[in-house]
Amino acid sequence: MSEDKVITAHITETGQSAYAVAIEVNGHSLKGDEPESFGGGNTGPAPYDFLLASLGECTAMTVRWYAIQQKWPLEKVEVTLTHQKVGKVDKFEKTITVHGDKLTGEQRQKLIEIAAKCPVQRTLEGKVEITTV
């Protein structure tokens, strides 16, 4: 993503449950909610579900992009993530599985290294400014 591109998301309560929302972003419509155990109706993913999905999606796409650039025989990439809040620290764990019988051990290792360079991960690890108006 270029540095000057602005992405806008619009979120509106739907009334389906106490926390249910409709999400419009970049021409896509999504639903969000909290699980019933948190007072929601579980009509869609919760905010941290979306955060994990964003990190996983970006990771898979970054690995695929790199394999394409290198013309490596990557058949499929899978990303499994967990999130846990420990005190004031958010801990994420990513498990990357790269499939491809013709990939060398060196290529597999490089793809795992590249997985840590996805833009969403860099955003989460970097300096972020949020302005509320």
Could you describe each region identified by the protein language model?
Residues 1-53, 61-133:
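Extended beta-strand/beta-hairpin segments
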